[in-house]
Each structure stands twice: as C-alpha cells, then as structure tokens.
C-alpha cells in the first residue's frame, strides 16, 4: 500500500494544523522543491511544514470521541457527521475529517451541527 493511502491527505492535515492540533507524527507534508509540484511526504520534521498523520496516530487521537469509528463499505470509509453519513477515500482521511468536525464542534461560536 502506498504511503499516501496510509496518511491523511494534504488538505485535511493542513486544516488540523490550522486548528492547532499538536504537530508530532511519523511523517510530515513538505513543500515541493520546484514550484508547481505536489507536496511530498518526509520523515524529517525540520523540512516538513505540518504533520501527515497516519491511521494509527489518528486512531489514538479519536479514541473515545462520541459516535462510531469509521467503517469500510462500498469502496469508501464512512463516518457520521451529526446525522449525516460522510464518505472519504481512505481510513486516514475519514479519521482526520471526523477529528476536524469534533474540534470545530467544540469551538465557541461554531456553526457545526451538535448532535
């Protein structure tokens, strides 16, 4: 399995950093050397700009959250966003999106559904 499928995608990880999630992980998203290239994964925290959390790391962070853990069905990872069922491409993405939703729900003056 490719490493990109075992960590949360760039956008979700960037949002986790913006939400001030502690940036400690095995892998990091690093800015490309050449402009216009895709961000790459590295284990070097010195050149990494923000954490690329693995399924296991996200599993530890989401342990004990309300609701069920993401489940796999019909080629997608599904999780509950309030009363809505949401699909993600990978388990890491589903766990990251669930954590983002939970953090936003806990923020004061949020607009996230509280169910």
Description of each model-found segment:
Residues 1-115:
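Glycine-rich anion-binding surface patch
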